[in-house]
Amino acid sequence: MINQSIWRSNFRILWLSQFIAIAGLTVLVPLLPIYMASLQNLSVVEIQLWSGIAIAAPAVTTMIASPIWGKLGDKISRKWMVLRALLGLAVCLFLMALCTTPLQFVLVRLLQGLFGGVVDASSAFASAEAPAEDRGKVLGRLQSSVSAGSLVGPLIGGVTASILGFSALLMSIAVITFIVCIFGALKLIETTHMPKSQTPNINKGIRRSFQCLLCTQQTCRFIIVGVLANFAMYGMLTALSPLASSVNHTAIDDRSVIGFLQSAFWTASILSAPLWGRFNDKSYVKSVYIFATIACGCSAILQGLATNIEFLMAARILQGLTYSALIQSVMFVVVNACHQQLKGTFVGTTNSMLVVGQIIGSLSGAAITSYTTPATTFIVMGVVFAVSSLFLICSTITNQINDHTLMKLWELKQKSAK
């Protein structure tokens, strides 16, 4: 029986951890081209290239490290994986504040991907600790913390960076992240992790988890559409700043306009994420994803066609309302399909595959923006969003909460080993 008071306390800490982590990581994202230009005298093409590399860099090392951290969480403690990720992020933010060249910044971003991963660790912890009937709602609310952090980060980033400078801003966030880590060490309580002597004899190999995820139709197809969602989303990141500048015919500063656009997107995401989670709990996950990704694609195309800030703002709001359903739905399918003692391994393995889209999308988006126009980038990525829905539309997957195929595969493996 789950102790509700402990669970509520744990959830608040996880929500706060994700909020601080994402806010700290997103303070620079909308202003990344400006930040790169401040580090070194670069051409427009070089700025876009370095910005794309900087966005993609953490994903490269995350792809390698995420399954390993997930497996360690299942084996040792999911709580300490959350704390490890917070501490790693705090150290990397501190090092970012000391960077003086784009290359140094990219190298630290690689370290961030290797030692960070707060969202993955929190998702694994939450999915193992939460009541089974509320997992969708819990993942939806955790997604709202990501959205809230992504909203607050750019807002405080633009204002604080103008007053204190980028280095002081990063130093401050590093200190706050470290404080949250200490608080989590004192207050976070793990109740579902079994001592090693009581743990069932389950094969927890990373290679085995990849096989199970990719050989099961439901998880495989959801991971594919998740990869495409990340590809499209991250492909638009470096294009937003120049797109906003090109359609800004007002007296408002471009940096402020970008902040308003990001605020609109993430506010919409905060409001909609828990709602999508509740729909998933009611077993509508396939329908939710198909509807949301098509609407998200249409919103991206509309942004590419925008000729003024008002139209661009409306399209950003629509994208925020729908994008919040996507990755949480992928994780919902995965955590409901795997064994209780394998949540971390499967979440880590899934994230390792999802970041492939982040890497390729960041670089592709930067390349398209450099050699065509920002509007073209948004239209291309919108088409990717919409077309990805075909992987679910053309499947035989039904709207169900649990798919126990993965559990059965692990049980068969266990029996054959005896």
Swiss-Prot record:
Q: What are the inducing conditions?
A: Up-regulated under iron-deficient growth conditions. Repressed by Fur under iron-rich growth conditions.
Q: Which PROSITE patterns match?
A: MFS
Q: How does it sit in the membrane?
A: Multi-pass membrane protein
Cystine connections: none
Q: What is the protein name for this chain?
A: Staphyloferrin B transporter
The UniProt entry, under Gene3D superfamilies, shows: MFS general substrate transporter like domains
Gene label:
sbnD
Q: State the deletion phenotype.
A: Deletion of the gene impacts growth in iron-depleted media. Mutant is partially impaired for staphyloferrin B secretion.
- In which domain of life is the source organism classified? Bacteria
List the top taxonomic levels of the source: Bacteria, Bacillati, Bacillota, Bacilli, Bacillales
Q: Which stretch is the leader sequence?
A: none
